[in-house]
Amino acid sequence: MRETGATDEGHACEVVVAGGDGKAAAARRRRRLELRRLGLAAEDDAAAKRIRSVKDGSSSDDSSTEVVPRSWPACVSHGSVSVIGRRREMEDAVAIERTFMASTGDGAGAIRGGGEGEEDFFAVYDGHGGSRVAEACRKRMHVVLAEEVSLRRLRGQSASGGDVRWKEAMLASFARMDGEVVGSVAAAAPRVDGTEPSGFRTVGSTAVVAVVGRRRIVVANCGDSRAVLSRGGVALPLSTDHKPDRPDELERVEAAGGRVINWNGYRVLGVLATSRSIGDYYLKPFVSAEPEVRVVERTDKDEFLILASDGLWDVVSNEVACKIARNCLNGRAASMFPESVSGSSAADAAALLAELAVSRGSRDNISVVVVELRRLKSRAA
C-alpha cells in the first residue's frame, strides 16, 4: 500500500507498507503519546509525522519459542522504517530480501551448514553527498553476495569452514560493490559544458548487512551504521562503528598517508565523519570499503536484531533501543493501550525507534530495520 500525505512542515511524506502480520496501518498510528506512555519520549510533538516509508513482513510460523535449532525459521517477521528527519534529502536506503539466495536461480546459493538453504538478507545503507551510492547498494549488494557465496560452494569448499566462507564472501562482495561504484564514477560522462562531474566523486555510503539463517547470523559492517542483537534480554552489538578517532582506524588512516582532523567532530581529512565507506572516490585510500565481519551461532535466547543508521544510534543507546523493540514485540504496549496501540509487530518497533530518535534531536536521516527471530512468550497472552 502506498500513500502520500503532508507533514507538519508541508513536506511530502510517503508511507509504504507491505503487510505480513496484518499491521498495514502501523506507521500511521505512531504518535508522541505512545512514546510517552512507554516513558521514553522527549518533548517533540512533530516527531511522529516525519515517517517516509514503512515496510512490514512475516512468515506464517507461529510455533512455540521452545524449539530446537533445526526448526528455527530464519526470520519470524521483520519491519523497517526510513525517516527523512530534519534533512532536506533522504540519502539512506534499506534492503530486505527474504530467502535471497534463491536469486541465483539454480539453488546453488544454499550453503551447507549455513542455514540449510534459508537465508534472509537485511541491510541499511547510510549515504552521504547524495543517495547515489546507497541506492546502488540497495539494488546490487544482495545480488553480488549471492553470486559470491554460490561461487564458493561450486568450488567445493568444506561445509565445516562455514564461518570462513561467509567472511570471504562478504569481503569479496563489498570489494566488488565498491569497485562497481568507483568504476561508474570513472566512467561517468562529462557534463554538457565538458567539465567533469566531480560531484560523483564525493558520494559514498556506509553499509551494515545481516544474513539471518536458521543456525547463524552473519553481520558485515563498513562505516557507522550498526547491528545489535537482543539475546536473553541483553543488548549485544554485532558490529563496531568505524569512527576516525577509533585508535586502530586512526592508525590505519595515518599509515595510508591521510590525516584525521577534529573539525566539528573527528573527520578523515577534516571532511568525512566515518573512516570506512563504499564509494567516496576522492578520499581513497584513506577511507576503506573493507567491512568487519562477525558470525554468531543462533541460540534459543535470541529475540530480535536491530539494524540502523547513525541517525538512531547517535541519540539512542543499544539498551534503550532493545527495550523499546521488546515492549512492542512482546505485546506489552498493545495490552496496556489496546484502543490506540497495536504494538506487537516489528514495524511498530522500527517506527517507535525512529520517532524517539527524532524527538531526541537527531538531525540526520534515520533508517531502522527490526528482525524478529522468535515469538516472545508474553505476545500470545
UniProtKB/Swiss-Prot annotation:
Mn(2+) 1 binds at residues 126-127. Induction: Induced by abscisic acid (ABA). It is an enzyme of class 3 (hydrolase). GO terms for cellular component: nucleus. GO terms for molecular function: metal ion binding; protein serine/threonine phosphatase activity. One of its GO terms (biological process) is regulation of intracellular signal transduction. It is found in: Nucleus. It catalyses: O-phospho-L-seryl-[protein] + H2O = L-seryl-[protein] + phosphate; O-phospho-L-threonyl-[protein] + H2O = L-threonyl-[protein] + phosphate. Residues 50-69 are annotated as: Disordered. Its cofactor is Mg(2+); Mn(2+). Mn(2+) 2 binds at residues 126, 310, 364. It holds the Pfam family PP2C. Protein phosphatase that acts as a positive regulator of seed germination. Involved in the positive regulation of alpha-amylase gene expression. Acts as a negative regulator of abscisic acid-mediated responses. May function directly by dephosphorylating ABI5 and suppressing its activity. This is Protein phosphatase 2C 51. It comes from Oryza sativa subsp. japonica. The lineage of its organism: Eukaryota, Viridiplantae, Streptophyta, Embryophyta, Tracheophyta. The gene is PP2C51.
